Curated annotation (Swiss-Prot):
GO terms for molecular function: microtubule binding. The gene is Psrc1. GO terms for cellular component: cytoplasm; cytosol; microtubule cytoskeleton; midbody; spindle; spindle microtubule; spindle pole. Residues 219-231, 302-315 have a biased composition (Low complexity). This is Proline/serine-rich coiled-coil protein 1. Residues 114-126 have a biased composition (Basic and acidic residues). Sequence repeats lie at residues 38-41, 68-71, 103-106, 194-197, 212-215. Belongs to the PSRC1 family. Residues 68-215 are annotated as: 5 X 4 AA repeats of P-X-X-P. It comes from Rattus norvegicus. It is found in: Cytoplasm; Cytoplasm, Cytoskeleton, Spindle; Cytoplasm, Cytoskeleton, Spindle pole.
Length: 329
């Protein structure tokens, strides 16, 4: 119990020494001896000064003096300081040599930030290894927009020109020459099929009259071709005129027929057949008379012309059945 009481010390009981720099204190420390034993190790508190050069105490009971450094330790410290100074001088010499070799190289002390570093490659030997971009190959963005607009305009104009022009391989042929080619290839040409010119109505009735053939103007070509084309056209017109007088047997719609006092209304049916042809017995061009069903539906000229006399009705021949060509494609 007594040992524990001796180990415990309060702050009030301790005496603090604040005059560590006074020379008198260093002389007093020479007389202080510390006993070290394995049972009670060295106690260091605020009231005791520690020696950094003190060696760890051994287990054996040996006395250590807390005094100034021994001359041997002072020599060791001096040698260590000299070595450090020599190393610092060598480092300084190396830095000065590097600065003399490269004057453009910035010093390590005043090194700027890496973002502000610039590199000039005009006189550098590495410039040939880097990719080069010529000034004319990279136009400014304003020129790029102008080039794009001009390209679009040029393509649009080219499209218009090609659409407006016909291919040069196709030769312009006159209609007369087409007629000659049609005569050579009757199967392929549209003129191979017999076509009749349009008919027109004359007078108050619905009598169909063949219109005269329309003359075709030949294209300006050589005199020989013009003479051949004209002679061929005249021959074709003569043939067509000889075949045209036969009226068509196709009944016209009743709505287009003019309504007269003697004619039958269109809604009740077809016009009444004329009995005169059956009495006189005029033969038809085809060689057969029209059947009864068709004779009732065929519009007669006498019924269409309500104002003509009975004598004129006897003179007029009935409509005859004629072959009508199909629509040409």
């Amino acid at each position: 119990m007594e040992d524990l009481k001796e180990d415990i010390k309060f702050i009030v009981d301790e005496t603090l020494d604040f005059g560590g720099l006074s020379p008198s204190d260093s002389h007093e420390e020479e007389d202080i001896t510390v006993l070290v034993s394995p049972e009670k190790p060295l106690r260091r508190g605020l009231s005791h000064r520690s020696n950094p050069n003190a060696v760890a105490p051994a287990l054996q009971g040996v006395r250590f003096s807390l005094g100034p450094l021994s001359p041997e330790k002072l020599e060791e410290i001096l040698d260590e300081a000299n070595r450090l100074a020599a190393q610092l001088e060598e480092c300084a010499l190396k830095d000065s040599e590097n600065a003399a070799a490269g004057p453009g190289r910035p010093s390590p002390r005043g090194k700027p930030s890496p973002r502000r570093e610039t590199f000039v490659l005009k006189d550098s030997p590495v410039r040939d290894l880097l990719p080069t971009v010529s000034s004319w190959s990279a136009p400014p963005p304003s020129n790029l927009t102008g080039l794009r607009s001009s390209d679009k305009k040029g393509s649009a104009r080219a499209g218009r020109v090609t659409a407006g022009k016909k291919p040069s391989s196709i030769k312009k042929e006159s209609p007369t020459c087409n007629l000659f080619s049609a005569s050579k290839n009757p199967g392929r040409s549209p003129l191979a099929q017999p076509t009749l010119p349009p008919r027109r109505k004359t007078g108050s009735g619905a009598r169909t009259v063949a219109s005269p053939p329309i003359p075709v103007r030949p294209a300006p070509q050589s005199s020989a071709s013009n003479s051949q084309c004209s002679s061929w056209l005249q021959g074709a017109a003569a043939k067509s005129s000889s075949r045209l007088p036969f009226p068509s047997a196709i009944p016209k719609p009743a709505i287009r027929m003019p309504l007269t006092g003697r004619s039958i209304p269109a809604g009740k049916g077809a016009l009444a057949p004329d009995p005169l042809p059956t009495q006189k017995g005029h033969p038809s061009t085809v060689g057969h008379r029209a059947p009864v069903s068709q004779r009732t539906n065929l519009p007669t000229i006498g019924a269409a012309r309500g104002r003509t006399s009975s004598a004129a009705r006897g003179r007029v021949q009935p409509l005859r059945k004629a072959a009508v060509p199909g629509p040409t494609r």
